[in-house]
């Protein structure tokens, strides 16, 4: 990845392997033809609908982990959609939020120097408890890849878990504590963010309630490429 101003990008520990998506099946599996023509089965870490980001014939990149303890040596990391790389590994965003917190990726969170992962709050586990001289804040992270034009949307299917998280964040605010919701927009071509009302009307309703309650929403645009991953700043919220 070319040198960029600002905080450092995240780079994959080993080179990714390019291929073409041939099929995705049973949610967890993807058939990919590598550049050398070799067919491989890769783990698909995104078990959701993957609306708009699962086109057969599209270029993809896989990570390779030759660990005999693994059932599959390949993991599907990203797909190219209309010229834009989209990250589909749902295991990465939370890890990269923590990685980015330590490296100044998020100016809105710069006041927090310590954090704890997976803290119980209400009926849910919240991804992060942030700690700093100014006090505490709860941070939940949501990954989204669904886009309509330049607008990212979440969710792309009904998510009762996501609804509970919103209710818990609203309750945190009612108790006078800070609550933040970071949407990891796993593609660089979106400049706006909105709740996916078409797919989950209740989530959209709770999202607007959360805004009114003072939950701080941070829809972060993320640039994804085979060379690395970096933040691009906030998208505009369209509620």
Swiss-Prot record:
Homology family: Belongs to the SfsA family.
Superkingdom assignment: Bacteria
Gene3D superfamilies given in the database record: 2.40.50.580, 3.40.1350.60
Protein name: Sugar fermentation stimulation protein homolog
GO MF annotations in UniProt: DNA binding
Source organism phylogeny: Bacteria, Bacillati, Cyanobacteriota, Cyanophyceae, Synechococcales
NCBIfam families: sfsA (TIGR00230)
Disulfide-bond pairs as recorded: none
